[in-house]
Amino acid sequence: YIVMEYLSGPTLQEYEKEHKGKISEKQAEILLEPVINALAYIHSIGIVHCDISPDNLIFNKEGQLKLIDFGAAKNKKKEKEEQYCKGGYTAPEQYLEKEFVGPWSDVYSLCAVWYEMLTGIKVPPAVERLQKDRLKNMTMASEVSEQTNNILKKGLSLEIQKRYFSVLNLSCDIKSNMESKEEITKQYM
C-alpha cells in the first residue's frame, strides 16, 4: 500500500471549471512548478506516473498543486505492460505496442494539462493526432506568448525524439521563458 498526505482541496479540473477554463500563463507556470519537481523526483528513482491529468492534480491548503493517484505508475526499466489511457492526456507511445514509456511520456501528459490550463481546450487524444495532427490547426489563446506556444508544441510532439526527454529539460525552458518575460516587463517599467 501507499501512504500519502491527506488533501481536501479542489482538483485542478474543479478549479478550471470554477475559473471558466482559462488560467493566466504566469499563474499556470507557478502552479505547475511543484508538479514538475515531484515528477523530477519520481523519475530520478525510476518511476513514471503514466496518469497525469487535471483530476490527478489537487490543491493543498497552501494553494500548491500536488500530484496524486500513482495507481498507473510504472517502473521505467520494466518491459511494456498494459497501459492506462486517459484521452488527450495520454502520450502516443502509451497506445503503441512497440514503444516504451518513460519520463518523456509524463512530459507529454503534463504539457497537455498545461495547454488546457492556458486555452480552456483539451488536446485531442494522441491516437486521433496520429491519424491527423489536429493540434497544428488549433489556435493558441492570444494572451499566450510565442515562447510558451513553442515549448508546448515541443512537449506535445507525437514523436518522442522531438519531445523533451525529461521534465528537467522542460523546466529549464519554462524558467528561461519566465525570466525573459520578467526582463521585458522591467524594461517597460
Regions found by a protein language model. Name each.
Residues 12-23:
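AlphaC helix of the protein kinase catalytic domain
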Residues 31-32:
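Activation segment signature within eukaryotic-like protein kinase domains
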